[in-house]
């Protein structure tokens, strides 16, 4: 199963699990939507994975730990102050049932990580559909390198960003790449999804290579110019 639970204004809490196994939860901006879904569907939770320390990804950790005191909360060191109990390192994270690759995707924050499990990429605020996160650290090289790392994943990788930013990102992508037909076509599909309050996510790495300016950018100079332009778009 793969489920994006809407939270706050435009966040998603992602749930992933194989058939008849406990699920993993990725980021938790608030607790109640998660609890409601888990109780309604009678799910067991194996782990909570945090991508970075921002409140709109961690504000539900405290209540989560109260309700699920035996479930480990994984995250980079910067999330320890927000309630992470297990600090992740780059490489392999093994839970009871899941073999998870931890990927360094710093730039949005100093220690932002992404998680790859069974061909599903949970990338927090590093990679969005048709966009990427703001570079709050000022380290554009880290951000560019992290996105290149994600870009190297197979085209059929299922990409699960943490925010419903796709329409706004596509508007900028059209501005930067006005001749890109794939962007125009995908925008039409996303508009139909959003009119009926359906998510535009997940996406795929293959699609993002076609429509995402920050993956299309061939060099650091172009990436930085486009990212700074998006900041004020």
Swiss-Prot record:
Pathway it works in: Secondary metabolite metabolism; methylglyoxal degradation; (R)-lactate from methylglyoxal: step 2/2
Keyword terms: Hydrolase, Metal-binding, Zinc
The protein's enzyme class: hydrolase
Source domain of life: Bacteria
Catalytic activity line of the entry: an S-(2-hydroxyacyl)glutathione + H2O = a 2-hydroxy carboxylate + glutathione + H(+)
GO terms of biological process kind: methylglyoxal catabolic process to D-lactate via S-lactoyl-glutathione
A GO molecular function held by the record: metal ion binding
Statement: the UniProt record of this protein carries the keyword Zinc: yes
EC number: 3.1.2.6
Residues that hold Zn(2+) 2 according to the record: 56-57, 125, 163
Keyword Metal-binding: yes
Matching HAMAP family: Glyoxalase_2 (MF_01374)
Protein's UniProt name: Hydroxyacylglutathione hydrolase
Species for this entry: Pasteurella multocida (strain Pm70)
Organism classification: Bacteria, Pseudomonadati, Pseudomonadota, Gammaproteobacteria, Pasteurellales
């Amino acid at each position: 199963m793969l489920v994006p639970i809407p939270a706050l204004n435009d966040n998603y809490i992602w749930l992933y699990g194989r058939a008849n196994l406990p699920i993993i939860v990725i980021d938790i901006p608030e607790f109640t939507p998660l609890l409601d879904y888990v109780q309604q569907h009678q799910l067991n939770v194996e782990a909570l994975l945090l991508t970075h320390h921002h409140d709109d990804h961690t504000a539900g950790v405290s209540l989560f730990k109260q309700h699920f005191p035996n479930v480990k909360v994984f995250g980079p060191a910067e999330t320890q102050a927000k309630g992470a109990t297990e600090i992740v390192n780059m490489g392999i994270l093994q839970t009871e049932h899941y073999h998870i690759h931890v990927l360094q995707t710093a730039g949005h924050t100093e220690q932002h990580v992404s998680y790859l499990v069974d061909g599903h990429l949970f990338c927090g605020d590093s990679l969005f559909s048709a966009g990427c996160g703001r570079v709050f650290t000022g380290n554009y090289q880290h951000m560019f390198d992290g996105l290149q790392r994600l870009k190297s994943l197979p085209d059929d990788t299922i990409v699960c960003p943490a925010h419903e930013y796709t329409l706004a990102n596509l508007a900028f992508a059209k501005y930067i790449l006005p001749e890109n037909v794939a962007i125009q076509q995908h925008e039409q599909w996303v508009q139909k999804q959003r009119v009926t309050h359906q998510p535009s996510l997940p996406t795929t790495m293959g699609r993002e290579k076609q429509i995402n300016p920050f993956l299309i950018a061939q060099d650091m100079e172009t990436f930085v110019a486009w990212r700074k332009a998006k900041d004020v778009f």
